[in-house]
Regions:
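Conserved interdomain linker/interface between the two RecA-like ATPase lobes of SF2 helicase motors
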Residues: 1-41
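Conserved Walker A/P-loop ATP-binding site and its immediately adjacent core
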Residues: 46-49
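Short glycine/proline-enriched turns and hinge-like loops at secondary-structure junctions
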Residues: 106-109
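C-terminal helicase lobe
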Residues: 136-190
Length: 190
């Protein structure tokens, strides 16, 4: 079991945490959704390093006057509370967070959630949705982009999440071929 855990951690690091292509997928989805004013947005990552890598990539590549922040378990309590409060009040356009965001957080202005965490947990998947579906007069629809990564193990997780969403009666649109034809799509480098 220890060997399997090391394998999974390395797979996750190589495929997601340290993979510039994975950052570009998140960036492309944000750019696409920003055209339709789907901000504020929350990007959920699994690990601290992934969270920081995505944040740095977005900060260095997104155009415009966007307020981008990140929060994870190592963020000091006082700073974390301020970031969460600013995001809740619409002062932060894009928040990149680890899964600590899953429980007990209320973000009524949130319009877009990008799940970049690639986890196989029905409970966490549904908890993420809970951050998104809070009602507010400023929104009539919400959007969830769930990034499905390549490789048998991670693809299986993505398929499971899609099944969880369908059980919740969500309209699931797979981008697959449509996304590959989209003008904003950048091909996979491999």
């Amino acid at each position: 079991q220890f060997h399997a855990s090391l394998f999974i951690a390395k797979l996750y690091d190589d495929t997601i945490t340290n993979n510039r292509w994975a950052y570009e997928v998140v960036l492309d989805r944000l750019r696409y959704n920003m055209q339709y004013r789907r901000l504020p947005a929350l990007v959920v990552c699994k690990y601290v390093q992934h969270c920081e890598n995505i944040y740095k990539h977005l900060k260095s590549t997104l155009e415009g006057n966007l307020n981008i922040a990140y929060v994870h378990v190592n963020t000091q309590d006082k700073a974390r509370k301020k970031i969460m409060e600013d995001f809740r009040n619409g002062k932060i356009d894009i928040l990149v967070s680890t899964t600590l965001i899953a429980r007990g957080k209320n973000f009524p202005l949130l319009k877009l959630l990008i799940n970049a965490a690639s986890m196989d947990s029905q409970e966490k998947s549904i908890q993420f949705l809970g951050r998104l579906v809070r009602t507010h007069k400023s929104k009539s629809r919400v959007y969830l982009d769930d990034i499905q990564y390549f490789g048998d193990y991670l693809t299986r997780h993505g398929n499971h999440r899609r099944m969880y969403y369908q059980r919740e009666k969500l309209k699931v649109i797979q981008l697959g071929k449509q996304w590959k034809k989209h003008p904003k799509h950048r091909p996979h480098p491999y």
